C-alpha cells in the first residue's frame, strides 16, 4: 500500500489526478473556495474529526484529494482527544504517581517523603494542557496537509452535498464527490437515571470532578469503568463497581486474565459487585445518592449510598440528524451504518468508518479504517483483519489482548495449546518491584500459529503490539521464541510465553 501511495502522490503532483483510475472518473477537479459565504467544492468531505475522521482527512489530502473535514464541536479531535482516551490517560498516569508516593511503595524503594499532598486543580491543568497541545497538533497537520476545516454540524443534504450548520444558524454548503461519515459515538444513557455531569456523571464528567468523592459508585466494570474507577480510588475515593456480568474487563477479555485482574484491583482497594444490576438511583436532600441494586437474576434489593455516581454502560453510534433517512440509508438493529468491505454504504460514494459501523469502538480501529477507506477511494487495496486489532485497559497493571481468547477457541472448536509466563519471574519486573501479572499465549495445536495473546502486567499496552504484528504476519509461537529480545526487558516475558507454547516450557520459570 505504501508503494501505491507514493505513486498516487507523485501523479497528483504532476497534474495527472484526473487521468488515473481512482473512482472519480468523469468529474473535473475544481479549486477549493474557502470563503464563508460561498460553497466549497471538494473531492472528499469527512464528517467528524475524531481519530478516524482526522486521520482519514489527512490521508486523503496526502493522496491528492481536495479534502474538507467538518467538525460540530469547537475543537478538533472528537471524543477520544477531548473527553476520552487522552484526558483519561493523563489522569491515570498522574494518579498512579500519587498512589505510589502516598502509599508505602516509595518508602520500600528508599524514597522517604515527609508530606504528600494532592493538588487536584494542578492535576487537571496538566491533563488540559496535554489535550490542548494535541488539539493544536491536529490543526497544524490540517494546515500542513491543506485539509480545509469547516466548523458546524454536518448533514448530508444530497448525494454529493454536505451542509455544515454553525451554532448561530449560519451554514456552509460543500459540494463533494465523496462523503465519509466518521461521527463516532456517544454515551449510552441508563434508563431512569439522568446524568447532570455534577454528581451523576458520565465518563465526561468523571474526567473533571472538582474534588475527590468520599464514595464513588460505578455502573459497569468494563474498560471505562475500571479505568476511571481506578483514577479516583488511587486519589482516595472508596470505589464500588456494579457489574451485570460475572467478570470485570468487559467483552473480549480472557476469563483467566479477568479473574487475576479482579484480584489485583481488589488488593488495591477497588470493590466489585458482579452479577448485579442497578434498578435505580435517587438523589437525597443532603446531596448524596442512593443507588438501588439487586442480583442480576433477581433477588433481595440493596441500597448503596455514594457522593458521586458514574454511569459507564457503554457507548452508542452517533448518527442523529445526518440526513441518512432522507437518503434511504437504514441503520442496523444496533444503530450502526451498514457498509461493505470497502466501507461504502448503499450509496457508493458515501462511506462510513469507526464507531458508526460494526466492530469494536476503538480509536485505533477507526484510524485504520480511515486510512484504508480513502486508499480504497483512490483505487487501492482494502484490507483489515479485525482479529488483529488489539484492546488495552490502561489501569495498573495494564491489561491487553489481541486475537482469540480461550473461550472463543473452545466455542469455535479449534484445538489449541497454551504458553504462560509470570512477570514475577521476569528480571526487569523484579528490578522494578512491579511483578503482578502474566503473559498468556494461545497457539494452534497443529501448526503452532499464534492465535491469541493476553497480557496482564506492566507495559502490557506496549507489548501487545508485538503480538498484533505476529498475528498480522501469521507468525508461529516458535518464530517469536527465536527472536532475540533485549535483556533485561519486560518483553522477554512475551518471548518466554511463546517458548512455553511452542516447546512446552519456558527457560526462566
From Swiss-Prot:
Modified-residue entries (N6-succinyllysine), positions: 66, 122, 132, 143, 159, 166, 273, 277, 410, 430, 505
One GO CC annotation: mitochondrial matrix
Modified residues (Phosphoserine): 285, 297, 502
MF (Gene Ontology): dihydrolipoyl dehydrogenase (NADH) activity; flavin adenine dinucleotide binding
Single Gene Ontology BP annotation: 2-oxoglutarate metabolic process
Co-factor(s): FAD
Compartmental location: Mitochondrion matrix; Nucleus; Cell projection, Cilium, Flagellum; Cytoplasmic vesicle, Secretory vesicle, Acrosome
Co-factor binding details: Binds 1 FAD per subunit.
Cross-referenced SUPFAM superfamilies: FAD/NAD(P)-binding domain (SSF51905), FAD/NAD-linked reductases, dimerisation (C-terminal) domain (SSF55424)
Post-translational modification: Tyrosine phosphorylated.
Targeting presequence: 1-35
EC number, as in UniProt: 1.8.1.4
Catalytic activity: N(6)-[(R)-dihydrolipoyl]-L-lysyl-[protein] + NAD(+) = N(6)-[(R)-lipoyl]-L-lysyl-[protein] + NADH + H(+)
Active site: 487 (proton acceptor)
Residue positions, PTM N6-acetyllysine: 66, 122, 132, 143, 346, 410, 417, 420, 505
Key words of the record: Acetylation, Cell projection, Cilium, Cytoplasmic vesicle, Disulfide bond, FAD, Flagellum, Flavoprotein, Mitochondrion, NAD, Nucleus, Oxidoreductase, Phosphoprotein, Redox-active center, Transit peptide
Site positions (Important for interaction with PDHX and activity of pyruvate dehydrogenase complex): 448, 473
Summary of the function given for this chain in its UniProt record: Lipoamide dehydrogenase is a component of the glycine cleavage system as well as an E3 component of three alpha-ketoacid dehydrogenase complexes (pyruvate-, alpha-ketoglutarate-, and branched-chain amino acid-dehydrogenase complex). The 2-oxoglutarate dehydrogenase complex is mainly active in the mitochondrion. A fraction of the 2-oxoglutarate dehydrogenase complex also localizes in the nucleus and is required for lysine succinylation of histones: associates with KAT2A on chromatin and provides succinyl-CoA to histone succinyltransferase KAT2A.
Self-association state and partner proteins as the record states: Homodimer. Part of the multimeric pyruvate dehydrogenase complex that contains multiple copies of pyruvate dehydrogenase (subunits PDHA (PDHA1 or PDHA2) and PDHB, E1), dihydrolipoamide acetyltransferase (DLAT, E2) and lipoamide dehydrogenase (DLD, E3). These subunits are bound to an inner core composed of about 48 DLAT and 12 PDHX molecules (by non covalent bonds). The 2-oxoglutarate dehydrogenase complex is composed of OGDH (2-oxoglutarate dehydrogenase; E1), DLST (dihydrolipoamide succinyltransferase; E2), DLD (dihydrolipoamide dehydrogenase; E3) and the assembly factor KGD4.
Note: The active site is a redox-active disulfide bond.
Protein name: Dihydrolipoyl dehydrogenase, mitochondrial
The species this protein was found in: Cricetulus griseus (Chinese hamster)
Gene name in the database record: DLD
Amino acid at each position: 500500500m505504501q508503494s501505491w501511495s507514493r505513486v498516487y502522490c507523485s501523479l497528483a503532483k504532476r497534474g495527472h489526478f484526473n487521468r488515473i483510475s481512482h473512482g472519480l472518473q468523469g468529474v473535473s477537479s475544481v479549486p477549493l473556495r474557502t470563503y464563508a459565504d460561498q460553497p466549497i467544492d471538494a473531492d472528499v468531505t469527512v464528517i467528524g474529526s475524531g481519530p478516524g475522521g482526522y486521520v482519514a482527512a489527512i490521508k486523503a489530502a496526502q493522496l491528492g484529494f481536495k479534502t474538507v473535514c467538518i467538525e460540530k464541536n469547537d475543537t478538533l479531535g472528537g471524543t477520544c482527544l477531548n473527553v476520552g482516551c487522552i484526558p483519561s490517560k493523563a489522569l491515570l498516569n498522574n494518579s498512579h504517581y500519587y498512589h505510589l508516593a502516598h502509599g508505602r511503595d516509595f518508602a520500600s524503594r528508599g524514597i522517604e517523603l515527609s508530606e504528600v499532598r494532592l493538588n487536584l486543580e494542578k492535576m487537571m491543568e496538566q491533563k488540559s494542557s496535554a489535550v490542548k497541545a494535541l488539539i493544536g497538533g491536529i490543526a497544524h497537520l490540517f494546515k500542513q496537509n491543506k485539509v480545509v476545516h469547516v466548523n458546524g454540524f454536518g448533514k448530508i443534504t444530497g448525494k454529493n452535498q454536505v451542509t455544515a450548520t454553525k451554532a448561530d444558524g449560519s451554514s456552509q454548503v460543500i459540494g463533494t464527490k465523496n462523503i465519509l461519515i466518521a461521527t463516532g459515538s456517544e454515551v449510552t444513557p441508563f434508563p431512569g437515571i439522568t446524568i447532570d455531569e455534577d454528581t451523576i456523571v458520565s465518563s465526561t464528567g468523571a474526567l473533571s470532578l472538582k474534588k475527590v468523592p468520599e464514595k464513588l459508585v460505578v455502573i459497569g466494570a468494563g474498560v471505562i469503568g475500571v479505568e476511571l474507577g481506578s483514577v479516583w480510588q488511587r486519589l482516595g475515593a472508596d470505589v464500588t463497581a456494579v457489574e451485570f456480568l460475572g467478570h470485570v474487563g468487559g467483552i473480549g477479555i480472557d476469563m483467566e486474565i479477568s479473574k487475576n485482574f479482579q484480584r489485583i484491583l481488589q488488593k488495591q482497594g477497588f470493590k466489585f459487585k458482579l452479577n448485579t444490576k442497578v434498578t435505580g438511583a435517587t438523589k437525597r436532600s443532603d446531596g448524596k445518592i442512593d443507588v438501588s441494586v439487586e442480583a442480576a437474576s433477581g433477588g433481595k434489593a440493596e441500597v448503596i449510598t455514594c457522593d458521586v455516581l458514574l454511569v459507564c454502560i457503554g457507548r452508542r453510534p452517533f448518527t442523529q440528524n445526518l440526513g441518512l433517512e432522507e437518503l434511504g440509508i437504514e441503520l442496523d438493529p444496533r444503530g450502526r451504518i451498514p457498509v461493505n468491505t470497502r466501507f461504502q454504504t448503499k450509496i457508493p460514494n458515501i462511506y462510513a468508518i469507526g464507531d458508526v459501523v460494526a466492530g469494536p469502538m476503538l480509536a485505533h480501529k477507526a484510524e485504520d479504517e480511515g486510512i484504508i477507506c480513502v486508499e480504497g477511494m483512490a483505487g487501492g487495496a482494502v484490507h483489515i483483519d479485525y482479529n488483529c486489532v488489539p484492546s488495552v485497559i490502561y489501569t495498573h497493571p495494564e491489561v491487553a489482548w489481541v486475537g482469540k481468547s480461550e473461550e472463543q477457541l473452545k466455542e469455535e472448536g479449534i484445538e489449541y495449546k497454551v504458553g504462560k509466563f509470570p512477570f514475577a519471574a521476569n528480571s526487569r519486573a523484579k528490578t522494578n518491584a512491579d511483578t503482578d501479572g502474566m503473559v498468556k499465549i494461545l497457539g494452534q495445536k497443529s501448526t503452532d500459529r499464534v492465535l491469541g495473546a493476553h497480557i496482564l502486567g506492566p507495559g502490557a499496552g506496549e507489548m501487545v503490539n508485538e503480538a498484533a504484528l505476529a498475528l498480522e504476519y501469521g507468525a508461529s509461537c516458535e518464530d517469536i521464541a527465536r527472536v532475540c529480545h533485549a535483556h533485561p526487558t519486560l518483553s522477554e516475558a512475551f518471548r518466554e510465553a511463546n517458548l512455553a507454547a511452542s516447546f512446552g516450557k519456558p527457560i526462566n520459570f
